[in-house]
Amino acid sequence: CKSYEESLKYVSAEKYISFGGLLEYYGFDENERIGIAEKYSLELKQDYDVAALATNTQLKTIYDNLCEEIKQKSKEQDELLLQYLLQNKMFGKVGIVDIGWKGSMQYYLETYLESHNMDVSLMGFYVGILPNKTLHGETHGFLYDTNDHELRKKVLCFAGGLERLFQSLEGSTYGYRKEFGKIVPVLNAYEYAGSPEIQKCISKLQDGALDFVKENANCSIDDKKLAYKLVQFGVSPSLKDVRLFSPFYNTDGTCLLYTSPSPRD
C-alpha cells in the first residue's frame, strides 16, 4: 500500500471495528496486538467507526510508525497464501460456498487470483447474494440474487441468526504459516470459546438444519418456498422465538447482545 488510506480498502464492511480488529487486519498476532496497545495506551476493545478510519489522525500515526512491519507481513502472507492455493491444487473451475450478502469474499479472491495469473474460474453458491462490486465468476443465491432479490430485505432482517447456521466451532482464519513442510491456516481465538451454552445452541441449530436438508433433498418444492417458515421466523418472531437467541452476542467490536434482556432476566 502506498498510503494509510489505501491500506484500508479491504477492511470489513461492518459499521465498527475494534483497535484489536484493525491490528489483526494488518497481520499482527495476539501477543503483538497486546504490545502495540500498551505502547500507545489504547484498549484493544476500543471501537472505531469504519467510515471515519481514513480521517483518524491517531490511527494514521500508528500506521505510519508500523508501516514497514505491516508491508513485510503482507508480503509474507501473500506468498504463503499463494503456496497454500497451489498446494491444494486450486485450478480450473472452483466452487466456493459462503452465506453471502455482498460478494466481498469472491471479489477479493478473484482479485488475488488475477494478480498472480492463476487460471481459476470461480462459481459462488450463497444463501443470498447481491454483489456491490463487479464479479467475473458466476454467483447463485438460493433465496435471492441479482436476478430475483425480492426476499433480500426479509433475509437480512435475520442475518445474525442465519449466520449461526454457518458458524464454525473454531476460530476464523487470519493468516497462514509453514508447518512440517506444509502451509496451514492460522486460526484466531474462537469468539465463543468461553460460552459453552452458545456452542451447544449452534450445534443444535446446525444439526436441525442438516436434518431438514436430508429430509427435503429430493423435494421438488422451490428453495424459496422451503425456506418460507425460516424467513418468517426472522421477520416476525414470537417472544418465545426471540428468547431462543437471548444468550447470543455480537463480537464485531464491543460485545452486544442479540436481544435486550427483560427486567426479570
Cite the ranges covered by each PLM segment.
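Positively charged, amphipathic N-terminal segments that serve as targeting/anchoring signals
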Residues: 1-217, 237-254
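Compositionally biased intrinsically disordered low-complexity regions
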Residues: 222-227, 240, 244
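Conserved small/polar residues in nucleotide/adenosyl-binding loops
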Residues: 258-265
